[in-house]
UniProtKB/Swiss-Prot annotation:
GO MF annotation terms: ATP binding; deoxyribonuclease I activity; helicase activity; metal ion binding; ribonuclease III activity; RNA binding
Chain residue ranges for the region called Required for interaction with PRKRA and TARBP2: 256-595
Disulfide linkage: none
Protein name: Endoribonuclease Dicer
Source organism of the structure: Bos taurus (Bovine)
Residue numbers binding ATP: L64, N65, T66, G67, S68, G69, K70, T71
Biased composition (Polar residues): 1246-1255, 1277-1290
Domain Helicase ATP-binding: 51-227
Amino acid sequence: MKSPALQPLSMAGLQLMTPASSPMGPFFGLPWQQEAIHDNIYTPRKYQVELLEAALDHNTIVCLNTGSGKTFIAVLLTKELSYQIRGDFNRNGKRTVFLVNSANQVAQQVSAVRTHSDLKVGEYSNLEVSASWTKEKWNQEFTKHQVLIMTCYVALNVLKNGYLSLSDINLLVFDECHLAILDHPYREIMKLCENCPSCPRILGLTASILNGKCDPEELEEKIQKLEKILKSNAETATDLVVLDRYTSQPCEIVVDCGPFTDRSGLYERLLMELEEALNFINDCNISVHSKERDSTLISKQILSDCRAVLVVLGPWCADKVAGMMVRELQKHIKHEQEELHRKFLLFTDTFLRKIHALCEEHFSPASLDLKFVTPKVIKLLEILRKYKPYERQQFESVEWYNNRNQDNYVSWSDSEDDEEDEEIEEKEKPETNFPSPFTNILCGIIFVERRYTAVVLNRLIKEAGKQDPELAYISSNFITGHGIGKNQPRNKQMEAEFRKQEEVLRKFRAHETNLLIATSIVEEGVDIPKCNLVVRFDLPTEYRSYVQSKGRARAPISNYVMLADTDKIKSFEEDLKTYKAIEKILRNKCSKSVDTGEADTEPVVDDDDVFPPYVLRPEDGPRVTINTAIGHVNRYCARLPSDPFTHLAPKCRTRELPDGTFYSTLYLPINSPLRASIVGPPMSCIRLAERVVALICCEKLHKIGELDDHLMPVGKETVKYEEELDLHDEEETSVPGRPGSTKRRQCYPKAIPECLRESYPRPGQPCYLYVIGMVLTTPLPDELNFRRRKLYPPEDTTRCFGILTAKPIPQIPHFPVYTRSGEVTISIELKKSGFTLSLQMLELITRLHQYIFSHILRLEKPALEFKPTDADSAYCVLPLNVVNDSSTLDIDFKFMEDIEKSEARIGIPSTKYSKETPFVFKLEDYQDAVIIPRYRNFDQPHRFYVADVYTDLTPLSKFPSPEYETFAEYYKTKYNLDLTNLNQPLLDVDHTSSRLNLLTPRHLNQKGKALPLSSAEKRKAKWESLQNKQILVPELCAIHPIPASLWRKAVCLPSILYRLHCLLTAEELRAQTASDAGVGVRSLPVDFRYPNLDFGWKKSIDSKSFISIANSSSAENENYCKHSTIVVPENAAHQGANRTSPLENHDQMSVNCRTLFSESPGKLQIEVSTDLTAINGLSYNKSLANGSYDLANRDFCQGNHLNYYKQEIPVQPTTSYPIQNLYNYENQPKPSDECTLLSNKYLDGNANTSTSDGSPVTAAVPGTTETGEAPPDRTASEQSPSPGYSSRTLGPNPGLILQALTLSNASDGFNLERLEMLGDSFLKHAITTVSLSALILDAHEGRLSYMRSKKVSNCNLYRLGKKKGLPSRMVVSIFDPPVNGLPPGYVVNQDKSNTEKWEKDEMTKDCMLANGKLDDDFEEEEEEEEDLMWRAHKEDADDEDDFLEYDQEHIKFIDNMLMGSGAFVKKISLSPFSATDSAYEWKMPKKSSLGSLPFSSDFEDFDYSSWDAMCYLDPSKAVEEDDFVVGFWNPSEENCGVDTGKQSISYDLHTEQCIADKSIADCVEALLGCYLTSCGERAAQLFLCSLGLKVLPVIKRTDREKAMCPTRENFTSQQKNLSGSRAAASGAGYRASVLKDLEYGCLKIPPRCMFDHPEADRTLRHLISGFENFEKKINYRFKNKAYLLQAFTHASYHYNTITDCYQRLEFLGDAILDYLITKHLYEDPRQHSPGVLTDLRSALVNNTIFASLAVKYDYHKYFKAVSPELFHVIDDFVQFQLEKNEMQGMDSELRRSEEDEEKEEDIEVPKAMGDIFESLAGAIYMDSGMSLETVWQVYYPMMRPLIEKFSANVPRSPVRELLEMEPEITKFSPAERTYDGKVRVTVEVVGKGKFKGVGRSYRIAKSAAARRALRSLKANQPQVPNS
């Protein structure tokens, strides 16, 4: 706008355009509408970018205000033209020359070019040295380097001597080119150019074309002269010209304030006094030595400041400032040592007090009297009054107010898909010092010259506001440049000052204050909102200060007011004319200069006449007209995805045609799908041409679907590929909670495997008999055998249990249970089939079946009824034995009949002994017996195993406790029992176990870590003493008919049947997937059995484990590697039907398994200390083996998979070898005789090494012998694994599938977490690849990202999983037979079970007691107390030996916890015997949390680790809230909200389970991981397709045959190879089942990656010149270079017209790297736990690491972007990396070491660097034909050092570490803004301090703060040595 008011105005005529008075209504131009989208002009681009465009186009002189932009322009120009200088110098290659004025500037330029490009740079600064060089020497230099940076003198010498001719230079850069006007080498160099035919491109850089005052004519002349000398056009940057043509110019007003009339004479008097005092000090004749400080300095300063305030603001302010200065002086006086200095200070102090006294005579300082202020101040207040907002504008206001700070805040998240970034509470509380939300219409700055003026003026305005209601709306503050300067050294005091200033700016930005009084520092560099009022209180003295203060008035309607005293006004008018002239000159030079006047003169065009609008629907539809089109285009560009540094804008070029008309060409940013430039028709003027082309553009954008039907940009949500998502409709349920979240839980029936449904045998129908084989494979190690008990291997006795059913049971893997004797391996083998039984037999069997569950195991309870015919799962469990001396097992009918007859079967037999018929002791009766004391507990008698017969004790022996003399006396006194036989021996007994959950070892927690135990000595002493044993008298006990050996096996039944159930369910799922997805076979070959189920960790190690290797002559060598502590060739003992072990010539029925370990011939015994870490099942001793071993490069044994060594591998027999040879670490192939496998190569097609755990990988421990034949004496029913099978062809091991179905809450030995993480990353990869490659060629990254997150969302996966029927199959709660076990043949009795239905809310993770630990503990105590009355102290009561020893506190703590949190509504009676009273009610507190538990006072000493299951850090929660919750199995966990008041679900524990939606989604991912590890990537993709996630293209049946995917061929051919006719049949069935109507093809690589473009190839060559060096560096050559270019092209790089920008490749690469790294970590032989995996993955897959690696491998030198901010951030980051030169972990401690610890500044990590690291991975993937291997070959070498460093020492994010360390007392503040636009976060660790962190986003700042807190906490911790 032309300034309407340049003439001085008297106040009456002062017409300010204030927002309130503006015709557009009061809400136009609100300051918080920050980044307004321009409607009438294209969004301006950064001035550096404009200048670069100009420089590329012609010779240019760049005039900038500061040095900052110069390097950017020079370096980018060099890079853009670098294709001209890469050639060989001797073959017409050119060179780029930088000229600088002085030697010290050379280094600076060199480092800039080296940092940002890979060009070779030569530096020449010393004229003396280089003057002596010969032409040859120079020639070498020119050949070696491509960019030459030299001082002007060196250059002149080189050119003059003809060593280098100008025609060999492609670009000549002059730094500080204004010097060329003088007589300077620059000028001479330019003279040489005059005669040169092909002159180089010239770039002149100058920042000092304007210095101080300057005459416009001179300036113009200077610029013209410079242009002439340098043959260039001068271009100025917009920072020298106010906002060029883009924004409306402010209205400029000069106000004549009139003279000051001093009626009271006070002003004159004060002025005189001050002058005198100043003169006096100046006259003092004090000699000042140069070293010393001037004593008068402070005094002079203070007095002259005071005088200035008086003159500018008047007496009232002078009085105020005098008061402030007195306070300031006091401080100085107190600290001043030197007498003379002190005297001056005291003099000044007195003088200021005098001033104050004078003022007090005239006015009271308390209130403001306007008679005593200058006219300037009065005018200022008048202006401010005009901005007073109107009252009561109610419309919209509050919303406006609330939304106001949207734009002033940083974009919080670094990128769109960072879901984890916390939402920030953005609404700041408005300060209370202004009355209404409308106050903020003013947004103004008053510029003053001196610091004190600012301070006092602020005081004055505040005072005026109190007195004048018109000014009450003002909320002002001042800011002085003190301490803001970037590079000043800062001390504590400055720091505080700095903080204060920052706070002031923050408030101004947030519009909490609306007026800022500032010194000139705010003119430049500080981030301030657009103001609508700028007042120059002191007139600008030079052009720069005029422009910069004016530049602050950027709001659409703004005023720039200059206040002038009458006497100054004349001279200022002159100045102002000068400034205007200078501005005009510079504006003509501005690279976008268009005459600004045009805007006002041009009327609003009636667009329809000129050019018809684009209308969607004729009547009322949205329309784009000529006048609105540009706004639409700007808005569209602003919505394209981009990083925080780049604001994408359209580029419009307008050219004049010969006939005087104009046409425009519009280019959109390169990541818009509309790639072609749009050319508009010729129009009469420039403005119209620009508008018309925008209109055409809108039409095109709408037609390709980029603008929606309201003509607004299409968001990523309204994707036009919705059909791709085919999201199913959300099922209608009444279940509260968001679908897919943890909060939403639903009930599902528990699955029952088909083969066990209704399979109860019927008379006369054929039956199947299965034997439950049990072999003790790992005896309990001594240090865990506290009572020194004898171990009872189950295979020592022949009688065992079997299963009788009417349907066949598929083969399932063997699995372990953990008894008191150690690990027992269970097998289910078919004994006979097709036989029938009579009704009597079946009735007997049925009665015994019920007897086992009701009496032996006591699992019958009122809620359960035995109804074998109605039960869902019904089959019989019955005893088997060797019948009639034959060696085969059969049903033991005789035994069953004996039991029926026995008196002791149910109750206690009433035997009477008397003196006449005394009790006779027979030893053999007690050798394998269970006994029942006959004198107590008649309703539920206790049962004991006889552990030992003490023949040396009799009832007359001494009783262990002093109260009784002898045992006989004790029984007489206590029970009144007389013994008839006084020399019978006594019995040492053990409880029969009531722990029925034997799935995991007693002494390990679920992660396989040993629980803490009390010291062995203590324990040993305890068990040695008689006091702690239970001693019974045989005469007083009855013998139970069930022998102890069988009883011990019966105790295992619930666990065995439960595991059997689960594995069959998993097997069923495997078969179902085989038919749905075509992965694996529907039914397994009969002779195949999967490897054993295993936990991946193993028992704490036996101190004397032996690693024995069988002698090579041993008949049996079916060795397998099993995850056991003992690496043994477990000779065929374990494959036998009844696990018989034909060892050499032994023929006995049962060989004690231990003989295998210690007596095999030729054994190698290695003592192994207990400190073993089970790696992959091959235990190694840390002292023997330094390092970790990578066995055959794969963890092949996850899951106890018997790894059969197939015959394809020849192994040399060797008998002994040092243990180091067991492992092969660095993957070097060993000599062939020590066969180890190399990964990734399939061996002969059949023996597949799997990609990772889950399938038998054939790997042999060197030294095991391998003969392929089955040993001759193996019976037919034993299985020999046949060579053709592997999980790859048959489908995953059911054990692994079970792992994928088991949640961590089930507290089993395995859970789905590791698999889930692998599946999660593969899923992301699969979805990404398909969305990019096959289907969507033109969607940009934001949309792709949105689609991906929709598909992989928990909500979607949950629906798919539910459709697939997973919830019923999942294992969600801990197995606890008394609580949730349903024995076979039982049904839940609906009437009685109501008492048992648990309200879901009360359900504590399916009840902790379930652990089977607590009830035991209680039961034990109760009993022992009875029997061992002689104990001295009750505290010693110790529970059953397999229970850990908890001291009373633990138990009390747990009680408190359970009772306090009302853990169970249904009380499980603490003694499992009183099965009747199962309905106590414990009520539940509303919300159980740590706070509300009534802990015992000694809670602090409670050792968490020992109660592993009870209190645990629950990582699953951390994901969601970033907070760790110490989870007590508290009810609110399992519920959908007691607190939320939603309905509770009640459900039956035996037949139903309650699962959170998210767990189902996790399970889907884990199953995917399971298929991926077992059957490979193709299988995993097919599995996803079968779920309904289309990750492969569908082929119609017809063309199926032609396009069979090679991988599918493999599947099928492998099927064909199955040996034998059966296999062929199953192969055929397989094909039939697979080839349904759908076939899936393979993903194709998208056909094009370059756009059709006439010059495409040439452009490509130019753009990637020099990239061959990069290809060498990463060791990969691109076949299609366009991918390479695309990977490095940033969205701002508009010179690339032939490919897309890197965003889509980055989206792909991100998923690929995430998957490859996760897979690598998953397969690490160290078998990281889920928590560690998560930490490692987030430490390695993050932007910081990727960016650091990108810089390390020079990615940044090839990066193509045109973005000044990004340029500087990368520059900083690279410098920082060079200094640090050491990569760090998580968040990589990227901070500059600042001495002042006050705030921690995290260095900015440029996201773009991490992005190109990812995009290159995507490019290699595409270029190599979608080969993940290729990508990993390139990336693994780069990442390996980090992977190894972190795996050895897992980093955690500082925020998480802090929250884990101090979860209760850590509080993070919301974000605050700092003065330069960054974010500050404060973390308070209550009681330990507050710590601040600063960064560009909330997340960075938060982690910086957390890191400082951690450093401080760790420093103050007492150092505890790591135990």
